[in-house]
């Protein structure tokens, strides 16, 4: 480790101990050296004994900085790793940090634009940031060419070395988890960290975020439910993104929404519809839909529209995952637990040799109590959570796309019920899911598939006679090759039979000669002739095998 890494590790250890996080070390024989070492560091006592463990963990991560804050946010969605009281505290982590110098941001913008002054491209550039987070911060300006209001997102300077240094330490900690926890290997800590690192590195590439925003805007063009600001891609680079400035009410500001007369029921239902449309219609969903990234337009409060920003994290599901997920939801709400178990096996989410009866019973045991509540109070996110946690006991592999989906669904549900506590997610989502499944099977799906593939077959039609001729010729050649191989195999079997016969004769002659040589030494030449004959016969048999 470098001196810098050692200093950083010391700071992390001191922070963890000052918040009493040594409580997380399990009391096992293998951890005894760690617990002894902890006692030796007596000058680092727990200074927050009045707080619960979950709160102390959250405060420690906030003190350690942006990389650890985002790591905690990601862990809050993995409720199979932590008890609810810790996961709930991690979900409260806020990605808010002090802004860096506006002059430095201006310099970065100029570097991204080819060392040309900001004033060449933009008017009214505000040196004071509009918002600041751990990865980037945002400044306002106007496009010089048309005067449109824009925001410029700039990556923090020198953030990459900080991320790489902290990720090294997180990887070191992850390697210890399987050794320290009895269930550590099943939790796949290295996969969790790799997933987090990929998400973090993706957020550093604003060209990727620009492309995501453009795609999402195209998917919801002229939609009454969601507006995505325009991206000015000519000005975008890996470290800078320029997009239309929007004005709206933060979705978490319930008072402001009510004061302008917003139809809260419709707004909450549209949030659910937007989510399911992204997942099932588009196979492309905004996976960071926390309240800080969602606004509501000031226009037409009786017919409200969402505004979505910050498309750094997106998810997608393939066709099979979408179908299995939709059928899982419907089977669950129909209490068809056998179907749920079979779908998990058919999808490959659990191994094919899983005992379906045992799996069905486990799902029933965990999920049946949920129906003690009214349907309007049942959480889709927690349904998924319960299903996946049960499936993990049957060796379900971690599915990163489903983890993202679960996190996003929990956000959507939380926002929806904050807007309209009586929101019935199942009533809102069921027609959409049933319509989507109906569209994926039967005659409509067959017709659509034919239409999609018709241009390909029309293009290949002239080649079909030649392909048929080639197929017949190859079939004939293949038959000749098979006949030749069959003859060779038969010949080999005959030779092997002859070889075994000759080996037997040769061995018999050699053994007879040896016995005569021992018992009748007066028969001078006979043993020698027998042994020589046996050797010759044995050699002939050996050559037959060549």
Swiss-Prot record:
UniProt keyword list: ATP-binding, Cell inner membrane, Cell membrane, Kinase, Membrane, Nucleotide-binding, Transferase, Transmembrane, Transmembrane helix, Ubiquinone biosynthesis
Subcellular location: Cell inner membrane
InterPro entries in UniProt: ABC1_dom, Kinase-like_dom_sf, UbiB, UbiB_bact, UbiB_kinase
Gene Ontology BP annotations: regulation of ubiquinone biosynthetic process; ubiquinone biosynthetic process
Active-site annotation: 288
GO cellular component, one term: plasma membrane
Sequence positions that bind ATP: 130-138, 153
Transmembrane segments: 501-521, 522-542
Pfam families with a match to the protein in the record: ABC1
Record-listed E.C. numbers: 2.7.-.-
Gene Ontology molecular function terms on file: ATP binding; protein kinase activity
Domain Protein kinase: start-end pairs: 124-502
Membrane topology recorded in Swiss-Prot or TrEMBL: Multi-pass membrane protein
Functional pathway: Cofactor biosynthesis; ubiquinone biosynthesis [regulation]
Domain of life: Bacteria
Role noted for this protein: Is probably a protein kinase regulator of UbiI activity which is involved in aerobic coenzyme Q (ubiquinone) biosynthesis.
Entry's family note: Belongs to the ABC1 family. UbiB subfamily.
Record-given protein name: Probable protein kinase UbiB
Organism of origin: Enterobacter sp. (strain 638)
């Amino acid at each position: 480790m470098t001196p810098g890494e050692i200093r950083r590790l010391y700071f992390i250890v001191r922070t963890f101990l000052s918040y009493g996080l040594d409580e997380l070390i399990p009391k096992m024989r293998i951890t005894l050296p760690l617990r002894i070492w902890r006692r030796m560091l007596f000058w680092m006592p727990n200074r927050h004994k009045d707080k619960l463990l979950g709160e102390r963990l959250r405060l420690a991560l906030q003190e350690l900085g942006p990389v650890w804050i985002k790591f905690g946010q990601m862990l809050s969605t993995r409720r199979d790793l932590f008890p609810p009281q810790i996961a709930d505290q991690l979900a409260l982590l806020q990605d808010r940090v002090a802004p860096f110098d506006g002059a430095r941001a201006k310099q970065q913008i100029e570097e991204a634009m080819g060392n040309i002054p900001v004033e060449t491209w933009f008017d009214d550039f505000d040196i004071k940031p509009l918002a600041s987070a751990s990865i980037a911060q945002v400044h306002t300006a106007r496009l010089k060419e048309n005067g449109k209001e824009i925001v410029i997102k700039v990556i923090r300077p020198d953030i990459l070395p900080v991320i790489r240094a902290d990720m090294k330490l997180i990887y070191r900690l992850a390697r210890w988890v399987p050794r320290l926890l009895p269930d550590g290997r099943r939790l796949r800590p290295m996969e969790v960290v790799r997933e987090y690192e990929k998400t973090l590195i993706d957020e550093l590439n604003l060209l990727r975020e620009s492309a995501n925003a453009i795609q999402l805007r195209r998917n919801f063009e002229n939609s009454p439910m969601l507006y995505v600001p325009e991206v000015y891609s000519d000005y975008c680079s890996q470290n800078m993104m320029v997009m239309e400035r929007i004005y709206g009410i933060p979705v978490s500001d319930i008072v402001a929404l009510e004061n302008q007369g917003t139809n809260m029921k419709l707004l909450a239902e549209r949030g659910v519809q937007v989510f399911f449309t992204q997942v099932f219609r588009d196979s492309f969903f905004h996976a960071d839909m926390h309240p800080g990234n969602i606004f509501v337009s000031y226009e037409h409060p009786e017919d409200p529209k969402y505004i979505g920003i910050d498309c750094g994290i997106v998810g997608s599901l393939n066709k099979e995952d979408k179908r299995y997920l939709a059928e899982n939801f419907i089977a669950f709400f129909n209490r068809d637990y056998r179907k749920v178990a079979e779908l998990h096996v058919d999808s490959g989410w659990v191994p094919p040799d899983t005992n379906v009866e045992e799996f069905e019973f486990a799902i029933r045991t965990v999920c049946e109590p949920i129906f003690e509540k009214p349907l309007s109070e049942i959480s889709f996110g927690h349904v998924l959570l319960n299903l996946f946690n049960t499936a993990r006991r049957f060796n379900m592999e971690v599915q990163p796309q489903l983890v993202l989906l679960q996190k996003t669904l929990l956000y959507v549900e939380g926002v929806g019920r904050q807007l309209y506590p009586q929101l019935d997610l199942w009533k809102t989502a069921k027609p959409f899911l049933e319509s989507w499944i109906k569209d994926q099977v039967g005659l409509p799906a067959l017709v659509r598939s034919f239409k999609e593939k018709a241009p390909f077959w029309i293009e290949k039609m002239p080649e079909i006679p030649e392909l048929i001729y080639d197929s017949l010729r190859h079939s004939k050649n293949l038959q000749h090759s098979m006949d030749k191989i069959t003859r060779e195999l038969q010949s080999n079997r005959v030779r092997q039979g002859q070889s075994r016969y000759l080996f037997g004769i040769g061995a018999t002659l050699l053994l007879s000669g040896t016995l005569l040589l021992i018992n009748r030494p007066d028969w001078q030449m006979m043993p020698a002739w027998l042994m020589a004959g046996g050797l010759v016969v044995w050699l002939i048999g050996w050559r037959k095998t060549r």
